[in-house]
């Protein structure tokens, strides 16, 4: 039976594009792990995707994951079938434009083949303590880039 893991993620950018950071909480039973990272020049969406990728990549075996994010971009791409359509359409949007962040989407796809992940949208900057902690981690990571 797969381990059940809960992950909260958030990405932030000071300017968009600009210096960015991401934060994640991984929870398994009574264990909670906090991770974060940054990039000197990036976008908010790249940090949102990066947070999910980095968190999932830390899992040492296939897991059943509930991943919570305040990123509509990330959650809708998965839950509304955008990601599947983009792949079928040679990474073109419905408007026939190139999908942004293909490199990160491809990394995420590989991880989604390993783990069974359910994506959940949470309201950002509200009363969700886990999401707020991820936001704090992301913002602290940005400070380390300057």
Swiss-Prot record:
Cofactor, how bound (note): Binds 1 Mg(2+) ion per subunit. May bind a second metal ion at a regulatory site, or after substrate binding.
Cofactor: Mg(2+)
GO BP: DNA replication, removal of RNA primer
Chief place of localization: cytoplasm
InterPro entries named in the record: RNase_H, RNaseH-like_sf, RNaseH_domain, RNaseH_sf, RNaseHI
GO molecular function terms attached to this record: magnesium ion binding; nucleic acid binding; RNA-DNA hybrid ribonuclease activity
Enzyme class: hydrolase
Pfam family, one: RNase_H
Origin: domain of life: Bacteria
EC number(s) from the headed UniProt entry: 3.1.26.4
List of residues binding Mg(2+) 1: 10, 48, 70
GO cellular component: cytoplasm
UniProtKB keywords: Cytoplasm, Endonuclease, Hydrolase, Magnesium, Metal-binding, Nuclease
Location in the cell: Cytoplasm
UniProt binding sites for Mg(2+) 2: 10, 135
SUPFAM superfamilies: Ribonuclease H-like (SSF53098)
Record domain RNase H type-1: where: 1-143
Catalysis: reaction(s): Endonucleolytic cleavage to 5'-phosphomonoester
Functional note: Endonuclease that specifically degrades the RNA of RNA-DNA hybrids.
Subunit and interaction comment: Monomer.
Family recorded in the similarity comment: Belongs to the RNase H family.
Listed name of the protein: Ribonuclease H
Organism: Chlorobium chlorochromatii (strain CaD3)
